[in-house]
Swiss-Prot record:
One of several proteins that assist in the late maturation steps of the functional core of the 30S ribosomal subunit. Associates with free 30S ribosomal subunits (but not with 30S subunits that are part of 70S ribosomes or polysomes). Required for efficient processing of 16S rRNA. May interact with the 5'-terminal helix region of 16S rRNA. Gene3D superfamilies: 3.30.300.20. Monomer. Binds 30S ribosomal subunits, but not 50S ribosomal subunits or 70S ribosomes. Keywords: Cytoplasm, Ribosome biogenesis. It comes from Nostoc sp. (strain PCC 7120 / SAG 25.82 / UTEX 2576). NCBIfam families: rbfA. One of its GO terms (molecular function) is ribosomal small subunit binding. One of its GO terms (biological process) is maturation of SSU-rRNA. It holds the Pfam family RBFA. This is Ribosome-binding factor A. Belongs to the RbfA family.
Length: 133
């Protein structure tokens, strides 16, 4: 069992290397359909499994196509990680679509709509709070 510090260092290293592979290593055209970025990597305590969370910008069809390309490139990514990262055993790689950025954007949009929908009379001013005392 690896220490927490080692697990986090390996996760950061995998994140950096997979990001580099997405830029110029994976030749599958489906991966280039949507703009892809690695948001997080979760490595198991025994360093045998790595969940790679990716954010994909584009239409739903482009996202599905990109995920299919990433799933088919899993073997290539694992072999490249084995060559680039010095570990006794290269972890099994799983790509997972990360929709947290998309959800965060929706929440911010809703909050902005609510703020714009408020009338200026609804917002108490600093003078109103002083008058009550």
């Amino acid at each position: 069992m690896a220490t927490n510090r080692r697990v986090s260092r390996v996760a950061e290293l995998i994140k950096r290397e997979v990001s580099q592979m997405l830029i110029n290593g994976i030749k599958d055209d489906r991966v280039g359909t949507g703009m892809v970025s690695v948001t997080d990597v979760d490595v198991s305590g025994d360093l045998q499994h790595a969940k790679i969370y990716v954010s994909i910008y584009g239409t739903e069809e482009a996202k599905a196509e990109t995920m299919a390309g990433l799933k088919s490139a899993t073997g290539f990514v694992r072999s490249e990680l084995g060559a680039r990262v010095r570990l006794r055993r290269t972890p099994e790689v799983t790509f997972i679509e990360d929709r947290s950025i998309e959800r965060g954007t929706k929440v911010l949009t809703l909050l902005n709509k609510l703020e714009n929908a408020r009338s200026p009379d609804d917002i108490p001013s600093a003078d109103d709070s002083l008058d009550e005392d």
